[in-house]
Amino acid sequence: MNIFLSYIVLGLSLSAPVGPVNAAQIDKGIKNGFWHAWIFGLGAMTADGLYMLFIYFGLSQFLTAPFVKTFLWLFGFFVLTYTGIETLKNVREPMDVRSSRGKPSYRKTFASGFLISLSNPLSILFWLGIYGSILAKTAEAYNMNQLLIYSSGIMIGILIWDFCMAITASTFRNLLHEKLLRGLTGIAGVSLLVFGFYFGYQGIKQLLG
């Protein structure tokens, strides 16, 4: 049981570093409330789970192929830059926290989280480095069923983090003044653009190198 809990804590730790997913999830919570923020997080978690499956079934060589990495860097640049620009465009719009008008569908929100996480090559390197090494170490001492159980512990940790992020962002939405909410939305938008430009730089570097 203690080992399983340690994998849940590991999932929380893996989710905590600030990145494009966390920035976008905060923006979703501020603009659209808890459910949109959490569903966005579920979309991102689904992409994480997909990468875990790839590594679990030994497909890491495909993920690290130069063509795949270049494609993901450039696709990530497009997704993050577009999302960042849209976020900044909406900063000046009035924020009515009680109105559901103009909110995207849950399906679109889920897809947005999935794409942002899936198109993040840093996620691949992260999961290859962390989960790959954990998988190799755990496989020496445990059978396949236990590996699946401990891997699910990591996903539970990610799920808990997404839930906490959604609560935090929706709390900001309900308690903070509109000007401060606009400021937080602006910071989220700029963060997404910075990550987007970084991805674009890496994609061009990979393409030319």
UniProtKB/Swiss-Prot annotation:
One of its GO terms (molecular function) is amino acid transmembrane transporter activity. Signal peptide: none annotated. The chain crosses the membrane at residues 1-21, 39-59, 62-82, 110-130, 147-167, 184-204. It is a multi-pass membrane protein. It comes from the Bacteria. Keywords: Cell membrane, Membrane, Transmembrane, Transmembrane helix. One of its GO terms (cellular component) is plasma membrane. It is found in: Cell membrane. InterPro entries: LeuE-type (IPR001123). The keyword Chloroplast does not apply. The keyword Nuclease does not apply. Pfam families: LysE (PF01810). One of its GO terms (biological process) is amino acid transport. Belongs to the Rht family. PANTHER family: AMINO ACID EFFLUX PROTEIN YCGF-RELATED, ARGININE EXPORTER PROTEIN ARGO. This is Putative amino acid efflux protein YcgF. It comes from Bacillus subtilis (strain 168). The lineage of its organism: Bacteria, Bacillati, Bacillota, Bacilli, Bacillales. The gene is ycgF.
